[in-house]
Amino acid sequence: MRVAIIGMGTAGVSVLRELVKHPKFNQLDIDLYDDKVNMGQGVPFQNDSSELLINMPSKKMSLNLDDETEFWKWYKQQTDFNFDEPAYLPRFVFGHYMKSYLSMFTKKYPNISTNYNKVQEIYTNSNIDETNLTYYICTTNSGQSWQAYDYVFLTCGTFAYHDPYNLKGKKGYIATPYPTYNTLDEVNELDDIAIIGTGLASLDVVRYVAAHHPKLPITMTSRSAHLPSVRGTMIDVTFKYLTKDKLNDIKKHHFGNAPLDTLVSLFLKECAEYDIDFKKLVHRRTGNHIADLKYDLARPTEMGIFQSMIEHLKENLNWIWNSLSIEDQHQFNQKYSKMIQLNSNPMPPRTAELIIELIENKSLILKKDLEDVKHDGKLYYFSYKNQESVDIYNVVINATGAKSHLNELDQDDQLIKNLENRQIVQAHPMGGIQIIPEANQVISPRFGTLTNMIAIGQMTNGVNKLRNGVKMIVEQVAHTVSQLYDALESNEQQQRSDNQ
């Protein structure tokens, strides 16, 4: 069986790790596709400044669901990197951990090949009425260079960043913040810099720019200007009310769906079990960034339990989210998505302490109520609600986060646009592409369920709601890779039957 893995970041490497475990792995011919920069590391963990920290404790990050300390053990055994404060390691170190496994596998198994070209096209040229599809992968726009595959994993990573003010291509606009050590390449020492976005990506930019750009302060701005929370001391959590059995029982009485209000009530009962006042903590922010960060820093136990509850909710959100009606999914997005995002994926305490220091010494300005950004060919003009004058900058760094809907994509995500145009994938109303929940099999508007095409990661965000962390991606992989070997066994049985 010929297998293609398209994208070799967290999801792609995890797929390969699962595949090699099977006794029939040697019956596969596997081609890995990515460029030389991202092969084995992916964009989030690419080589970058050591100031960019993983937002999870090093001892809690792993591609191994059975050993959450695997990354930490790898770090302690290797000799290339050594850091004074390894509790939160630089992000690129995790990339090298992933890449070490890819290197080991490609050396050990002769049936793995690497292709350092970006995939431009995926198509199927099946006969009419034929449902057993072969997929053709091209690394050129002309379609002259292609390879045929029986099974495809779409592990392409996140979509490109939003461009909310249509600034892409303008001088002084940096459309993506990564790698951060390139953000200042074309910036003059006296340039005033603004960062659009106040999430984790913007904090990465601040860490780097504040350390390397002489003209301060930097301005970080968005509509709300909410910062992520600060990571506390995480604990293991088990739900006793919001469970699959309970949800299945609820669905029996509500036409196959579970009412959102009922599920929220069950989650609040879970919080009460751990003595967490969920509503108080959700609304704890005062708008004073220093006070809010210090609040979190002073309560590592309470914040850690609170964050652990949200993290456990996210880990189980696939079956919760997909039990909701469309109407309730819209309600969830309006009322709870932002709330969860603000309180999950917290920043390391070290980052919070740096942000406080930068604000206090006037090296960083945080502003809310951003309404518009204009460019006159030379400068950028930021307008704010309830502010008559505009703020003027030479350079704008975009840290708004990745797009989520297919209708937002442009040439930066041309492969996905081509797949949609050829009716191999279709848009999910809540974001990303349509897949079968749990199985992650792509649903095509032309061919129906593509049992031999698996999509994993942010491109499935309409089904795998808010489940784009490393552990959640690895869990998706673990649930789906066995399907390939089921298909291989089915093919072998069919061949035996045909030969009789």
Region locations from a protein language model:
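Flavin (primarily FAD) cofactor-binding/catalytic cores of flavoenzymes
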Residues: 1-37, 43, 81-488, 498-500
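Active-site-adjacent segment of FAD-dependent monooxygenases/related oxidoreductases
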Residues: 43-90
